[in-house]
């Protein structure tokens, strides 16, 4: 395995002329990726949320590696001022994701780099697919894609099909320091619970689940491509209500989903999307808007474009030009 990884990374390093940002936490996955692909990495990005006792230790591990290998490092020290900017988001995982991807975008602009390496591994892939299946998600792709665009950044995952234990062994064999996130063992997050389930699987169970996921993704690939093209057209038309309302319910579902993701409304629930389809399916009423997140509402504006507006209940109603009506999800403008 060690020889195969070395041959693969050497090949990638030779054929790739692009320079990348790299998101590095200090854990074994990202430290292994950093060492494997350091020839292609121009800037290392590290985010310190200060939510764990070991946060500063992990930061120092990344700093020391970058100094030793003459790599530029950019660090986001997430303090209360940063958290306040994302105060409208209750879920910490969602908030943390938005914080780091905004940071990656900022650093990408600073260095004129549009490509980003992230160290998602095969265990992450399995965990994501498992949770999607357990929720009976309408996702058209189970797992994590090798490449996609997030917040305007081209994200590449070069170690996606390498097991976590293999990456940790790579670090040990190459004497690369790393930190272990102590919260990974706590059952406070759904992913941690799923991680324990998958870690108990036999190789045959892993293989069977992988086979199921590959089959699912193949069966949905044509429709997924159609949805991608439909959303590109929807976006090109500045989210015209007329374009949206002419689609069938299933297409509308994904147009709303992608719209919300595009506008940083992370993990919208299926019930929320279905409610929005019903809301927009009624006779167009520009005087109403539907809540998609705390203080954020979706509506059809005066130009008949679907858009978001911000409204805080503590605002002076006369200043905001908004009146509350009975449905707690809906406001009347």
From Swiss-Prot:
Its EC number is 6.3.4.19. GO terms for molecular function: ATP binding; tRNA(Ile)-lysidine synthase activity. It catalyses: cytidine(34) in tRNA(Ile2) + L-lysine + ATP = lysidine(34) in tRNA(Ile2) + AMP + diphosphate + H(+). Its main location: cytoplasm. SUPFAM superfamilies: Adenine nucleotide alpha hydrolases-like (SSF52402). GO terms for biological process: tRNA modification. Keywords: ATP-binding, Cytoplasm, Ligase, Nucleotide-binding, tRNA processing. InterPro entries: Rossmann-like_a/b/a_fold (IPR014729), TilS/TtcA_N (IPR011063), tRNA_Ile_lys_synt (IPR012094), tRNA_Ile_lys_synt_N (IPR012795). CDD domains: TilS_N (cd01992). Gene3D superfamilies: HUPs. It comes from the Bacteria. ATP binds at residues 25-30. It is found in: Cytoplasm. Pfam families: ATP_bind_3. One of its GO terms (cellular component) is cytoplasm. HAMAP family: tRNA_Ile_lys_synt (MF_01161). Ligates lysine onto the cytidine present at position 34 of the AUA codon-specific tRNA(Ile) that contains the anticodon CAU, in an ATP-dependent manner. Cytidine is converted to lysidine, thus changing the amino acid specificity of the tRNA from methionine to isoleucine. Belongs to the tRNA(Ile)-lysidine synthase family. The N-terminal region contains the highly conserved SGGXDS motif, predicted to be a P-loop motif involved in ATP binding. This is tRNA(Ile)-lysidine synthase. It comes from Ureaplasma parvum serovar 3 (strain ATCC 700970).
């Amino acid at each position: 395995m060690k020889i195969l990884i070395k041959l693969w990374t050497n090949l990638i390093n030779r054929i790739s002329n692009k320079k990348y940002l790299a998101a590095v936490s200090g854990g074994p996955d990202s430290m292994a990726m950093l060492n494997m692909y350091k020839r292609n990495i121009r800037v290392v990005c590290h985010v310190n949320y200060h939510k764990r006792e070991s946060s500063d230790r992990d930061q120092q591990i990344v700093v020391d590696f970058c100094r030793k290998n003459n790599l530029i490092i950019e660090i986001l020290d997430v303090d209360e001022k940063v958290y306040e900017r994302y105060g409208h988001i209750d879920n910490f995982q969602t908030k943390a994701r938005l914080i780091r991807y905004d940071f990656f975008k900022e650093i990408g602009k600073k260095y004129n780099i549009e490509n980003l390496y992230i160290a998602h591994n095969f265990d992450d892939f399995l965990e994501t697919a498992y949770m999607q299946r357990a929720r009976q998600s309408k996702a058209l792709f189970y797992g994590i894609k090798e490449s996609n665009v997030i917040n305007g950044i081209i994200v590449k995952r070069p170690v996606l099909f390498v097991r976590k234990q293999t990456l940790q062994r790579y670090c040990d064999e190459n004497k690369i320091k790393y930190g272990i996130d102590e919260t990974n063992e706590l059952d406070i997050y759904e992913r941690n619970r799923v991680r324990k389930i998958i870690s108990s699987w036999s190789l045959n169970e892993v293989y069977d689940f992988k086979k199921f996921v590959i089959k699912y993704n193949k069966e949905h690939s044509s429709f997924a491509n159609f949805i991608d093209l439909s959303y590109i057209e929807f976006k090109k038309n500045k989210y015209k209500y007329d374009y949206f309302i002419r689609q069938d319910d299933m297409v509308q579902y994904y147009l709303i989903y992608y719209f919300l993701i595009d506008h940083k409304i992370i993990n919208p629930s299926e019930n929320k999307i279905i409610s929005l389809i019903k809301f927009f399916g009624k006779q167009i009423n520009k005087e109403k808007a539907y809540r998609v997140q705390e203080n954020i509402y979706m509506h059809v504006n005066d130009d008949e474009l679907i858009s978001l507006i911000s409204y805080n209940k503590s605002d002076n109603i006369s200043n905001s030009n908004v009146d509350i009506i009975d449905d707690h999800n809906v406001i009347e403008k």
